[in-house]
């Protein structure tokens, strides 16, 4: 069912964070994600790419409202098993000229569901068919962006920067 939520970009109440999220800090969040490295490889996705996207879309500790309230770690739009939630989000019309829209994002029952849906999407959907063929994480993030995963012109560069900043290549 579609429900209206608050602004995706508002700060999260720390009390809500403690009651809704097991992963309360960056190390715990990275540990959660790195636990899916084998599954990422099985879908042709570099673990560093998966982790960088989760950090960019959810914050370095998974504390975005979308992650907290919808367990959506990757900013995935649309419906998941009939579940979705409407959020305010920013889109890039080109040249990093952002505008605010309301859009429907997938709602999950667990972080596991979010991660596995993300991997299935990138590993099997036709528009992402080139993504698993990438030889390097850098090539893979470029292909993900090129396939239309995000409108942000700087999406590829942001993901590469996160992989370097958090030393995510070690998980590959």
Where do the PLM segments sit?
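Catalytic cores of secreted/periplasmic lytic hydrolases that degrade extracellular macromolecules
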Residues: 1-172
């Amino acid at each position: 069912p579609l429900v209206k939520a608050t602004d995706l970009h508002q700060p999260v109440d720390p009390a809500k964070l403690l009651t809704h999220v097991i992963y309360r800090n960056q190390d715990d969040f990275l540990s959660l994600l790195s636990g899916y490295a084998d599954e990422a490889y099985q879908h042709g996705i570099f673990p560093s790419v998966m982790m960088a996207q989760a950090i960019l879309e959810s914050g370095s500790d998974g504390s975005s409202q979308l992650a907290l309230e919808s367990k959506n770690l990757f900013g995935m739009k649309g419906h998941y098993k009939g579940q979705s939630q409407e959020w305010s989000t920013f889109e890039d019309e080109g040249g990093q000229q952002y505008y605010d829209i309301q859009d429907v994002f997938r709602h999950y029952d667990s972080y596991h569901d979010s991660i596995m849906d993300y991997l299935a999407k990138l590993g099997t959907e036709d528009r992402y068919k080139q993504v698993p063929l990438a030889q390097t994480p850098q090539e893979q993030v470029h292909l993900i962006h090129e396939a239309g995963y995000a409108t942000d012109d700087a999406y590829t560069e942001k993901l590469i920067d996160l992989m370097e900043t958090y030393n995510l290549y070690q998980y590959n």
